[in-house]
Regions:
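Extracellular/periplasmic carbohydrate-active domains that bind, remodel
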Residues: 1-418
Length: 418
C-alpha cells in the first residue's frame, strides 16, 4: 500500500469528538509510504503519541488541525524506536495543537524542577519529538500551544525544518520553537514566523537533566529567516562540554525582550568547557521590545542583543549587515562579551545603530578577552541631546584591533586602546 487517505479508514472521523488515535496509528503501521490527512469536518483528536516509521511521509492539508486531547499528557508525533536509526521521514502541513491549557508536563507540575535525569517515557510538553533520524524533513506547518517546545530533535543528521508558523498563547515558560540537542549535523532551519516564549531556535549541544536527550557536538547548521513581532530570544547556542561548530544565522527580523543571540555556557555541567567555532550572523534587523503590557515572556533590558556568556570560548565570530534603531530607554549594549569569555576573532562589518532613546547605548561592551577585533563600515549615532554611549567600552582585554570606515555621531570617540 503506497498512499492512504485517513478519512477513508475505519476509526478516523475528524469530527473533534471521537478519538482518532487508533485509526491514525493503524495508517502509519500499514506500511504506506504516504499518509494523507485531508481537512476534516472539525479536527483530528489524538490521545497518544503518533509514531512514524522509516520511509514515510505524513502529508496534512495546510489547514488540517490535529489536536491533543485534554489531559493526554503526551507528545503528538515521534519516530519509532529511539534506540535504532530511522531514515527518510517527512512531516508536511497541518496545524499541530498541543492544547496546553489542558495539559500538565512534569516540568511545570514540579514547579519548573528540571534537575532530574532525562527519561524517554516522560512527557516533556513537546509537540514533535524526533531522535536518531537521518534525512528528516519538517515543513509547511503551524505549531500551536505546546507545554514547552514545538519541535525537539536529538541525534539527527541531514535535516530540514522550514516554513514553520508558531501560534503560541505564551501561557507557559520555556516555550521554545525548534530545539536541537547534541549530535545534530548538516541541517537547515528556515522561514520561522511568530513569537515564542523562549528561544525560537535552540542549538543546545548540552542541555542538562530533564531535557537532555543527548550530548555531543552540533555542526554545520544554517538558520535562515526568523520573524518575530515581540520575541523572547531568536537563537541560542549552548555548549557546556560539547563543541558547536560552523553555524550561520541569517535574516533575523523583529524586536526581542531577552536576546537576539545567547551564546555559550549555562553551567548545566559545571566545570566543563564551552566552545563555539566559526559562527556567522548575517542580516540582523532587530531592537529591544518595548515594555509589554503583560510581561509573560519576561523583560530583561540589561542583556545585550548579542551575549557571549562568561567563561565561553569562541574561536571565530562574524556579524555582518546588522541594523538596530532603538527607542527603548536604559537598554544594554548591542554586543556584550562576558567576564572570563574569550573570542579569538570578532569581525563586525556593515553595521548601523541609531539610538533614539535619551539614555546611552553602547555598541560593544567587552568584559572578557578579544584576541583580534575588526570593525569595518560601522556607523553609530545618538539622535539629539547630549553625547551618550560608546562605540567600544572596553573593561577587559583587546589584544589587537583594526577599524576602517567607522563613523560615530554624538557618541564618545572609539576606544582604540587595547
Amino acid at each position: 500500500m503506497h498512499h492512504v487517505n485517513v478519512l477513508e479508514l475505519p476509526g478516523v472521523r475528524g469530527d473533534g469528538a471521537h478519538d482518532d488515535t487508533a485509526g491514525l496509528q493503524a495508517a502509519l503501521d500499514s506500511g504506506a509510504a504516504v499518509i494523507h490527512l485531508p481537512v476534516p469536518s472539525a479536527h483530528y483528536l489524538i490521545s497518544r503519541t503518533l509514531v512514524m516509521h522509516s520511509g514515510q511521509a505524513l502529508l496534512a492539508d495546510r489547514n488540517a488541525v490535529v489536536r491533543l486531547a485534554a489531559h493526554a499528557h503526551a507528545h503528538m508525533l515521534t519516530n519509532a524506536d529511539h534506540g535504532a536509526l530511522s531514515r527518510g521521514i517527512t512531516v508536511q502541513g497541518g496545524i499541530w495543537d498541543g492544547n496546553n491549557a489542558h495539559q500538565t508536563c512534569e516540568y511545570h507540575q514540579n514547579g519548573q524542577n528540571w534537575r532530574v535525569p532525562y527519561d524517554p517515557a516522560r512527557y516533556l510538553g513537546v509537540l514533535l519529538q524526533f531522535n536518531r533520524v537521518e534525512d528528516l524533513r519538517i515543513s509547511q506547518l503551524t505549531l500551536k500551544d505546546p507545554e514547552t517546545f514545538g519541535i525537539q530533535m536529538a541525534n539527527i543528521r541531514r535535516f530540514t525544518v522550514e516554513d514553520i508558523t508558531f501560534d503560541y498563547n505564551l501561557l507557559r515558560p520555556n516555550m521554545d520553537g525548534v530545539h536541537l540537542h547534541g549530535n545534530c549535523h548538516q541541517g537547515r532551519i528556515a522561514n520561522l514566523k511568530g513569537d515564542t516564549n523562549d528561544d525560537v531556535v535552540a542549538l543546545n549541544a548540552d542541555d542538562g537533566w530533564m531535557f537532555e536527550m543527548s550530548r555531543g557536538p552540533i555542526t554545520d547548521i544554517q538558520v535562515d529567516g526568523v520573524w518575530c513581532e515581540r520575541g523572547y530570544t531568536a537563537v541560542r547556542l549552548l555548549s557546556d562540554g560539547s563543541p558547536i561548530r560552523r553555524v550561520r544565522v541569517a535574516n533575523v527580523f523583529g524586536s526581542f525582550s531577552h536576546l537576539v543571540a545567547n551564546l555559550g555556557q549555562y553551567n548545566v555541567h559545571p566545570g566543563e568547557p564551552s566552545e563555539i567555532t566559526d559562527l556567522v550572523f548575517d542580516g540582523i534587523f532587530c531592537s529591544r521590545t518595548p515594555v509589554p503590557d503583560n510581561a509573560k515572556s519576561g523583560y530583561i533590558p540589561r542583556y545585550p542583543l548579542f551575549k557571549v556568556a562568561p567563561k565561553t570560548f569562541i574561536r571565530n565570530m562574524q556579524i555582518n549587515s546588522f541594523c538596530r534603531t532603538e527607542i527603548v530607554e536604559n537598554v544594554a549594549p548591542c554586543i556584550g562579551i562576558g567576564e572570563g569569555a574569550r573570542v579569538e576573532h570578532l569581525g563586525i562589518s556593515q553595521a548601523s545603530v541609531v539610538n533614539l532613546a535619551s539614555t546611552p547605548l553602547d555598541f560593544l561592551h567587552n568584559q572578557g578577552s578579544i584576541d583580534s577585533l575588526s570593525l569595518t563600515n560601522v556607523c553609530c549615532r545618538a539622535e539629539g541631546g547630549t553625547p551618550r554611549g560608546m562605540l567600544v567600552r572596553n573593561d577587559g582585554v583587546v589584544a589587537h584591533q583594526q577599524f576602517a570606515n567607522v563613523t560615530v555621531a554624538n557618541l564618545a570617540e572609539p576606544d582604540r586602546e587595547a
